[in-house]
Design a protein with these regions (language model features):
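Metal- and O2-centered redox machinery and metal/ROS homeostasis
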Residues: 1-187
Length: 187
């Protein structure tokens, strides 16, 4: 059996090369486009965070919501996830805490590592990328439970994330950045 990192390398590379992801990394997203991305992240984190995380500092939903409020000027915010995000969220809601751990590994470590570079490239202050506490302990909380057997499920998580990035890019191209943020709750 391949180590987890090697087993997901191909799809991880594909996700990194998605047009929307590249535009985000290059600092090319408008406030509206990034806000729409954050809305998708909030829906995903809300679904994952119904279960206890390996470390309390991993909680992202609150930080993402702060970023959304900052970029939209606060007030009442209605968040409508994209079709691809709803599919992922529905899938996550079928999983037990143990079954969700590969999704924690993928979604949270991505923000902890790649997000540190991304923070300076995105609109707003990037609270989603800020973790309170010792980063080594926080990362260690995931690494301590990490299993190579997670490869299939982590690849499935990458498939969902690739679909979300693809839908974000298609929406971006068709609407020139109008968002599905009405103004929070997730619909």
């Amino acid at each position: 059996m391949l180590p987890l990192k090697d087993a997901i390398a191909e799809k991880h590379s594909l996700a990194e090369k998605m047009t929307f992801n590249q535009r985000m990394f290059n600092g090319e997203l408008s406030d509206e486009e990034y806000t729409l991305y954050l809305c998708q992240q909030l829906a995903i984190f809300d679904a994952i965070e119904i279960h206890e995380l390996p470390h309390p500092a991993l909680d992202r939903a609150g930080k993402v919501f702060e970023d959304i409020k900052e970029l939209t000027g606060g007030g009442q915010i209605q968040i409508t996830p994209l079709v691809a995000t709803n599919e992922y969220r529905k899938y996550l809601n079928t999983l037990t805490k143990e079954e969700q751990l590969p999704h924690v590994y993928l979604n949270y470590l991505a923000i902890m590592f790649g997000g540190q570079m991304m923070k300076s490239k995105v609109p707003g202050s990037g609270k989603m990328y800020e973790f309170d506490g010792d980063m080594n302990q926080i990362i260690g909380s995931i690494r301590a439970i990490q299993k190579d057997e997670w490869a299939d499920e982590a690849n499935k998580a990458l498939d969902y994330n690739i679909n979300i990035l693809d839908e974000l890019q298609r929406l971006s191209e068709s609407t020139s950045g109008e968002t599905a943020v009405d103004g929070g709750e997730i619909a």
